[in-house]
């Protein structure tokens, strides 16, 4: 039987696996993912299916835009997953397979997959959707992103909003709970994007001031 790790133990493992400084703007993301993944790993009803994998990889990619150095991003995800008992490469593969399986399906076809879901008879479907999986905000984002892949055209955002909420009950979750987590995700993403823009502006201003100081100190000027 696998030993259950505490959040503190998971964080200690993370720092061993990722011996670098996490920039301040990304620390909250790392902490929250470690806590949530640690809790999910200890839930008997939880399955790391395609919807979960899509949600986790999407959250990580969305919230680490602008992360520097770029070559540490993969190591960061691996460390977050490893310290909580998951495999980053495995989840990325599951997410890829789930996206391929869902590609081209409309909302009604996805509903049929959920309704007909049976692990023994449809293993490939089970990897995409595990109905009544233990709920988490990561799965909420996975549902949202799954539907977003099917939406297109000028009203893509509106179509996604309507369709993902229509799909929620089929997963066995309440609309209010999922909508709250998706809205929080969007709000948090907007805040971090603005924070990154501000950081970039400050960096440019500092470079400009340094250049001006160097120019003023040159002989004959």
Curated annotation (Swiss-Prot):
Residues 174-213 form a coiled coil. The keyword Transcription does not apply. The keyword S-adenosyl-L-methionine does not apply. Pfam families: ThylakoidFormat. One of its GO terms (biological process) is photosystem II assembly. Keywords: Coiled coil. GO terms for cellular component: plasma membrane-derived thylakoid photosystem II. It comes from the Bacteria. May be involved in photosynthetic membrane biogenesis. Belongs to the THF1 family. HAMAP family: Thf1 (MF_01843). NCBIfam families: PS_II_psb29 (TIGR03060). This is Protein Thf1. It comes from Prochlorococcus marinus (strain MIT 9211).
